[in-house]
Amino acid sequence: MANVQQGQKDKIVLAYSGGLDTSIILKWLQTERNYDVVTFTADLGQGDEVEEARVKALNTGAVAAYALDLREEFVRDYVFPMFRAAALYEGYYLLGTSIARPLIAKKLVEIAEKEGAVAVSHGATGKGNDQVRFEMTAYALKPDIVTVAPWRDWDFQGRADLETFAREHGIPVPTTKKDPWSTDANLLHISYEGGILEDPWAEPPAHMFKLTVSPEEAPDQPEYVEVEFENGDPVAIGGERLSPAALLAKANEIGGRNGVGRIDLVENRFVGMKSRGVYETPGGTLLYHARRAVESLTLDREVLHQRDALAPKYAELVYNGFWFAPEREALQVYIDHVARSVTGTARLKLYKGNCTVVGRRAPRSLYDKDLVSFEAGGDYNQHDAGAFIKLNALRMRVQARVDAKRTQQEVARV
């Protein structure tokens, strides 16, 4: 519980969305924990009205309320560095929720320092990954910070208790029926979890999706788009140079109208359970495939394979909340060094949910047409291949001889 000294309450900074749950948390922190509450609402491109949330926080009792436009910082300093790593969690998930949490938590800590707050708080439940991501970041940046997680601490037994508390404290409770799933959105994706989606056999309803049209309803003609990269990052799409946030938004628009970027998976949470998530990541999907196409021309084979070997670990670190851990930062140094060579253009063909690479070019391409040609010439002498093969097969030939000798000895004993 917050302390009261000489009439002054301790301050706490709350990650506030403006929704019912975080409004209840705001009031609960005031009434049950005796904090002065400062709220922080991040604009990550989710489409919500952040200024409206700021005003609502003040009306609900916050002593101060921050609303910050973090779209460019989010894409430039978090999404794009992660893209350079070709990170996919468990082979599918482009980490749209995971990568947003360290930035939100970082701003919570910065505001706490500015306001002289002793604690930070969030609305993540005690069963999910977000509680870990928020709090790991907070501790990494400010080791002595106090974290308060109401969903782990309060005595409410269910939604009915929460709504009763809200009404008792003048917090409006929506009367319209809530969607039977939860969502989280930012410029990179929208996620859908819980409710009817907890049955892994149940197909998501068509009306659930917001960023993408159904592949069946996508245009009957393919759309082609070119994506340009410089030193590892996308800088232009469709011939238009854009800022990081604007480029990702444009990629979302292009991919979304072609039904690209839907995935449905069961993933392994860091806290130990499996959960089903449905994601829309149209722009991220386009940029992932485009980048891999340019990398295929510009990266040395062993460098590419080494980077790809590190990618699952990098993705795991992001997913589990270790963005500010030294091992993730060390990996980033190598990944950024590799990415310096990734300059070029990829051409994509989008058609009814499919994203296919149909062209790639690069000014410093390692692809040598003369070398791979079936015609004679170039620096490659086909006669050398025989010796190359024999040398690489040497250990297997030795193993085969040893195995054959052992088999003969076993037969002789019989």
Swiss-Prot record:
CDD domains associated with the record: ASS
UniProt keyword annotation of Ligase present: yes
Binding sites annotated in the UniProt record for ATP: A15, Y16, S17, G18, G19, L20, D21, T22, S23, A42, G123
Protein's name according to its UniProt entry: Argininosuccinate synthase
TM regions (residue ranges): none
Subcellular compartments: Cytoplasm
EC number: 6.3.4.5
Source organism superkingdom: Bacteria
UniProt enzyme class: ligase
Binding positions for L-citrulline per the UniProt entry: Y93, S98, N129, R133, S182, S191, E267, Y279
The family this protein is said to belong to: Belongs to the argininosuccinate synthase family. Type 1 subfamily.
First-listed, main subcellular location of the protein, grouped into a coarse class: cytoplasm
Gene Ontology CC, one term: cytoplasm
Keywords, in A-Z order: Amino-acid biosynthesis, Arginine biosynthesis, ATP-binding, Cytoplasm, Ligase, Nucleotide-binding
Species name: Deinococcus geothermalis (strain DSM 11300 / CIP 105573 / AG-3a)
GO MF entry, a single one: ATP binding
GO biological process annotation, one example: argininosuccinate metabolic process
InterPro entries: Arginosuc_syn_C, Arginosuc_syn_N, Arginosuc_synth, Arginosuc_synth_CS, Arginosuc_synth_type_1_subfam, AS_cat/multimer_dom_body, Rossmann-like_a/b/a_fold
Quaternary assembly: Homotetramer.
Pfam families, sorted: Arginosuc_syn_C, Arginosuc_synth
Ligand binding (L-aspartate): T125, N129, D130
Pathway the protein takes part in: Amino-acid biosynthesis; L-arginine biosynthesis; L-arginine from L-ornithine and carbamoyl phosphate: step 2/3
Gene: argG
Catalytic activity, reaction form: L-citrulline + L-aspartate + ATP = 2-(N(omega)-L-arginino)succinate + AMP + diphosphate + H(+)
